[in-house]
Amino acid sequence: MANAPESDTNLWDMPSHLTPYDILLLSCEGDETYNANPQNLETYLNAGGRVFASHFHYSWFSGPIQSMQAYTAPADWGTNLATWAGGGGNDNNAIGGIIDLVLNGSMSPFPKGVSLQKWLTDTGALGQNGVAAGELSIFSPRYNSVVGTTDKASQAWITSDSSGMAGQTMYFSFDTPVNAMASADGGAPAYCGRAVFSDLHVAGDPSTKDTTNTAPPASCADTDLSPQEKALEFMLFDLSSCVIPDTVAPPIGIPIQ
């Protein structure tokens, strides 16, 4: 059709269409992505790209589970990142999200998890909407991923408590290339890119919804960000910053004078 927008699949039909973008935000589309190309996404990430994907975009990392499409996840993704389950989920109430404070597969501190907890504490995001003190309220959780101790490439950031389906990974990240070799001096691998998977709907919090049925700007309320939005804000800041190993504490920013 003349003058019609290009198909969204044209974005990922070749790596050169992805490389102009610093970050890709893949927001849930209500089903597994049609005709995705995980291999091209991996090429983009391995070259230093960043990806934030939510809910049904798990199919980029796991391959399609329920849609019976033909594309597959790269061999070093899939079950190397997490244990995956398909579907949309039907839990729209608030559950508690536990901030992960230790590195996956060890008892060593996860410095960025500690920073996330401090951020959420300082912004008043924890213990809201009836969840336990020190936990993040999560509306519309979706239970598609579990990062286990054998999933060495991945780091869980927030895990569901027993008020929902306990032990499900609500946020996790992994650096790329997944199989990057350690440096010659035995230090951390030279990672280039980073991906974050968010298994929830940020807009699920009722406080984010416009119920006035009026057009902007009259319907725009000057209210605080929801707890989930504050967590999202932190994750986007981290995603867009320099890639440093999860074992390293994030540097302290220098205030602009």
Please place each PLM-identified region on the residue numbering.
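Helical hinge/lid and interdomain linker segments adjacent to catalytic or ligand-binding clefts
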Residues: 1-70
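Intrinsic-disorder/low-complexity, polar/charged segments
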Residues: 13-14, 110, 226, 257
